[in-house]
A protein has these predicted regions:
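Helix-start (N-cap) detector for alpha-helical repeat units in TPR-like alpha-solenoids
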Residues: 31, 65-66, 99-100, 133-134, ...
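Structural signature of tandem alpha-helical TPR/SEL1-like repeats
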Residues: 45-53, 77-90, 100, 111-124, ...
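Structural marker of alpha-solenoid helical repeat scaffolds
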Residues: 60, 94, 128, 162, ...
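Terminal, low-structured helical/coil segments at or just beyond the last alpha-helical repeat
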Residues: 356, 364-394
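Alpha-helical adaptor scaffolds
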Residues: 277-284, 300, 309-324
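Alpha-helical segment of the N-proximal tetratricopeptide repeat
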Residues: 30-60, 70-73, 77, 107-111, ...
Length: 394
């Protein structure tokens, strides 16, 4: 072979190598640009644009763990869990030691209700780094959501040992302890969670419920009042305060609290339903005509709304029966039985109204529906009454 030909071949090889190297550099630059563009889109919460950018990056590097991870996370943020699952599985297959991929894949499985798989993935993460309080918390949460309360306690305690200021972990520990009937310890954990984060509404709500269940009325109502102050946009928070007063017989305080709620949330039907409920209970307990009139006044407007709930209509029907307006009560209670979700006692009170009006067949049908829906253990009296109504309708 002549020297010229050798030189020519060598030059061609060098040129090809240069072109190849340049293309590789250009491809790497474009890959990095697309990754950066996807990250920037995510900071603006533009998940669709992020997915487009990361897909472009994957077109350049199909075996990029990073691009699969980022696209999977983008799908997760959009709620497209099946697509997220696919990408995150690929990311963990490409790099089994990538802890972020393991965490996100665990999160997606947990969001899909696949708690056993989530537990496995969080454990794989912890095998690499066993001092990650957030992952220990997620492991405990996955156990808790799958109903394995005992198994949940250990990882949550370890999470707290690593980060004692992790308020959500203290709250989760309280839920686990409550599920195991360890009420004093649960209340202590809730107290610690609120000490760390006074705005943690779910913990305050749980502590209020436990206080009230333990007969600590003052403490429970104080927690509910604090919750109402923390979440002023939610009328049900102040309603819960009023109903708590009513349950312990403090009708005046209940009415005053619900009156404040009515002033603050004049368009919220749930406020008037609660007021009607309190006044009706007082009317029934004390045969109080004034309380009955106020119950009807509170419930009438709420029941007239097109979207009135079955519960509201049932309360209104009960008040009408008590006031002697049986015909109107029957009509309202018939309507209550057609609204989903149905309040089962609507059928019981409809049977009462229909029977009073001499509509034995309608009363029998309503009572039969109530018996079918009711979870009362002793139904003997009800079945006896049903038999009597069935005999009268023949």
């Amino acid at each position: 072979m002549t020297r010229g030909r050798v030189a020519s071949i060598t030059g061609a090889i060098l040129l090809a190598g240069t072109v190849f190297a340049w293309n590789a550099v250009r491809q790497e630059r474009e890959f990095r640009r697309l990754i950066a563009a996807g990250d920037a889109a995510l900071t603006r919460d533009q998940t669709y644009e992020a997915i487009e950018a990361f897909s472009g990056a994957l077109a350049l590097k199909r075996d990029s763990m990073l691009a699969h991870l980022k696209r999977g996370d983008s799908y997760r943020r959009r709620g497209e869990l099946t697509a997220a699952l696919r990408d995150l599985r690929e990311a963990t297959a490409l790099d089994p030691t990538a802890t972020r991929a393991l965490e996100l894949l665990g999160d997606v499985n947990a969001a899909m209700g696949r708690y056993e798989r989530a537990v496995e993935l969080y454990r794989r993460y912890l095998a690499i780094d066993d001092r990650a309080p957030q992952i220990l918390y997620k492991l405990g949460l996955a156990h808790y959501r799958s109903g394995q309360f005992t198994l949940a306690v250990d990882p949550v305690r370890k999470s707290i040992a690593l980060d004692d200021r992790f308020s959500e972990a203290h709250y989760l520990l309280a839920l686990c302890l409550k599920a195991q009937k360890h009420t004093p310890e649960a209340m202590a954990s809730l107290g610690r969670a609120l000490e760390l984060n006074p705005a943690l509404g779910v913990a305050r709500e749980e502590l209020a419920a436990l206080d009230l269940a333990q007969g600590k009325t003052r403490e429970g109502i104080e927690q509910l009042e604090a919750l109402a102050a923390l979440e002023p946009s939610r009328p049900e928070r102040l309603i819960n305060v009023g109903l708590a007063y009513a349950r312990v017989g403090r009708t005046d305080a209940a009415v005053a609290t619900l009156g404040r709620a009515a002033e603050r949330y004049p368009q919220a039907d749930v406020v008037y339903e609660a007021l009607g409920r309190v006044w009706l209970a007082s009317a029934e307990a004390h045969d109080d005509a004034v309380a009955l009139s106020k119950a009807i006044q509170a419930l009438e407007a709420a029941a007239a709304r097109a979207n009135a709930s079955s519960d509201t209509l049932t309360l209104y029907g009960r008040a009408l029966i008590l006031s002697g307006r049986i015909q109107t009560a029957e009509r309202v209670l018939q309507q209550a039985t057609t609204v989903w979700p149905v309040e089962p006692t609507a059928f019981f009170h409809l049977a009462d109204a229909a029977e009073r009006r001499g509509h034995a067949a309608a009363a029998s049908d309503a009572l039969a529906s109530y018996i079918a829906l009711s979870d009362e253990e002793d139904k003997e009296q009800l079945t006896d009454r049903l038999a009597a109504l069935s005999g009268r309708k023949r």
